[in-house]
């Protein structure tokens, strides 16, 4: 019955225009997109069912853009924007206003973007936008608060020192191509930011905080006309320096004809195997989504699947995989396997089985039914699922406004226009042993080094013999 439903949905949605928003009959929301004269792209969503109003600004700058001698500067600047503007110099003005109207705010710095967001009761939305917009027009960067906020960044860093996934991520960055920005330490601490000057903050701000590199999302019960008026009134003063989009070296991981293994000693009792492959950027392939197709095939759990085989052997408990972009220029495909104790002892057999399964995927033709099922489920979700409200939805939309064509923003996850066997096969071409690094995380693994910032113990080894084994394709009857 489920398959019949999916097939029926494919027939119904197959000829739909991918730009058309699929809506439930009772969905009375309205959307409008505008581009202000300063180049700022704006997405407006009005919904009478919302309980709160929310806004988000995404800026195309992140930890990859940190100067070599100022690791963490993008994150530090994110903190500093909350500490007063020329129009509202009181450092507590913004947070107090939001609190008085039942709201709050947040921000984060990622690899290639920074996002600021808030939510508030509808009656306080206009005033909140006035205060929020000044972050991007006239921040003070007051010297007296610099030391305080460096300590706040350092506290955030210290809080995460024992976080295994931050430790693993940091160690992984040590093995990308030498000199690539992926090697940079993103969070920052007293060591990297301790003597940062106001002029450094201002220069970084002027270099990257340009209206044409931003996306704004406003979500509220207020009308589209009201919100467009406020967007123009409060955000048109953001300066447009006509900065070009960031470009990063797509070759962030050098190919090497050997099996590369990183072993990490975790804080918690984790047993996990991660196999990663460097990819060109796939963000522009959002209409064909080859990474989702790859993940759907890899994550299949039924008879003949990789996970069912690993479970039968007593080696694995869980498996997840997929592919995506870190930036417009590069990304990665990865497979994460939760190991049993026996699987830990036989991790090479797990790696070999995984590569044999991937080779089987490669030898089969592109499976259009996978794309059609993903498309059908996405259409169902777009029509019937609750998309939520508040600042986290605003955050997602603002990021999409910044990263994708504005006409598709707000529904990137729902767009499945063209299955594109070419995109899918090109992705698979990068899933090779010479483009691979394997990370084994478990208590008791062999380690002989310590990472500087997190003091995490790890080791790195190469194995040419096992690499040659991986190149030999085994046809396993269990995968049929």
Regions found by a protein language model. Give the residues of each.
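His/Glu-rich zincin catalytic helix
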Residues: 15-93, 130-132, 202-313, 351, ...
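Scaffold signal of the M16-like zinc-metallopeptidase fold and its non-catalytic homologs
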Residues: 84-85, 128, 135-136, 144, ...
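Sec-dependent N-terminal signal peptides
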Residues: 3-12
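Structured mid-domain segments that build the active-site/substrate or prosthetic-cofactor binding neighborhood
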Residues: 287-365
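Stable alpha-helical elements in mature extracytoplasmic
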Residues: 69, 73, 90, 94-97, ...
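M16/MPP (pitrilysin/insulinase) zinc-metallopeptidase core fold and M16-derived inactive scaffolds
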Residues: 54-119, 162-164, 183-189, 300-318, ...
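Acidic/histidine-enriched alpha-helical segments
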Residues: 139-158, 223, 242-256, 323-325, ...
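C-terminal regions of mature proteins
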Residues: 21, 215-217, 369-480
């Amino acid at each position: 019955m489920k398959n019949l439903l999916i097939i029926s949905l494919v027939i119904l949605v197959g000829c739909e225009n991918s730009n058309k928003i699929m809506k439930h009959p009772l969905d009375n929301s309205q959307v409008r997109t505008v581009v202000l004269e300063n180049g700022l792209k704006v997405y407006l969503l009005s919904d009478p069912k919302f309980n709160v109003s929310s806004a988000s600004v995404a800026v195309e700058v992140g930890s990859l853009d940190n100067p070599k001698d100022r690791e963490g500067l993008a994150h530090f600047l994110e903190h500093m924007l909350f500490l007063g503007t020329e129009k509202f110099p009181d450092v507590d003005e913004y947070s107090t206003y939001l609190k008085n109207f039942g709201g709050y705010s947040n921000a984060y710095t990622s690899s290639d973007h920074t996002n600021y967001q808030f939510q508030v009761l509808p009656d306080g939305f206009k005033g909140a936008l006035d205060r929020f917009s000044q972050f991007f027009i006239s921040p003070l960067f007051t010297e007296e608060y610099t030391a305080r906020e460096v300590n706040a960044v350092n506290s955030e860093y210290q809080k995460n020192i024992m976080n295994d996934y931050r430790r693993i991520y940091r160690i992984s960055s040590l093995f990308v191509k030498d000199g690539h920005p992926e090697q940079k330490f993103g969070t920052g601490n007293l060591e990297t930011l301790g003597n940062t000057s106001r002029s450094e903050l201002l220069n970084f701000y002027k270099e990257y905080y340009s209206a044409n590199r931003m996306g704004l999302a406003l979500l509220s019960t207020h009308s589209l006309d009201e919100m467009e008026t406020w967007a123009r009134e409060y955000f048109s003063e953001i300066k447009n320096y006509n900065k070009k989009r960031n470009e990063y070296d797509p070759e962030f991981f050098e190919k090497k004809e050997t099996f590369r293994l990183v072993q990490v000693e975790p804080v918690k009792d984790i047993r996990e195997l991660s196999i990663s492959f460097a990819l060109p950027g796939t963000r522009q392939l959002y209409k064909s989504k080859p990474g989702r197709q790859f993940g759907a095939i890899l994550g299949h759990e039924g008879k003949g699947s990789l996970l069912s085989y690993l479970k039968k052997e007593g080696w694995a408990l869980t498996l997840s995989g997929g592919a995506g972009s870190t930036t417009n220029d590069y990304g990665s495909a990865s497979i994460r396997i939760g190991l049993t104790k026996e699987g830990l002892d036989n991790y090479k057999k797990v790696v070999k089985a995984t590569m044999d399964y991937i080779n089987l995927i490669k030898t089969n033709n592109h499976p259009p039914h996978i794309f059609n099922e993903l498309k059908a489920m996405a259409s169902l979700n777009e029509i019937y699922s609750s998309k939520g409200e508040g600042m986290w939805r605003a955050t997602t939309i603002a990021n999409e406004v910044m990263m994708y064509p504005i006409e598709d923003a707000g529904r990137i996850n729902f767009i499945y226009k063209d299955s594109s066997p070419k995109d899918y096969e090109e992705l698979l071409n990068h899933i090779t042993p010479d483009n691979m690094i394997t990370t084994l995380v478990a208590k008791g693994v062999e380690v002989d080094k310590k990472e500087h910032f997190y003091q995490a113990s790890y080791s790195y080894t190469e194995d040419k013999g096992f690499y040659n084994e991986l190149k030999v394709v085994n046809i396993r009857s269990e995968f049929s």
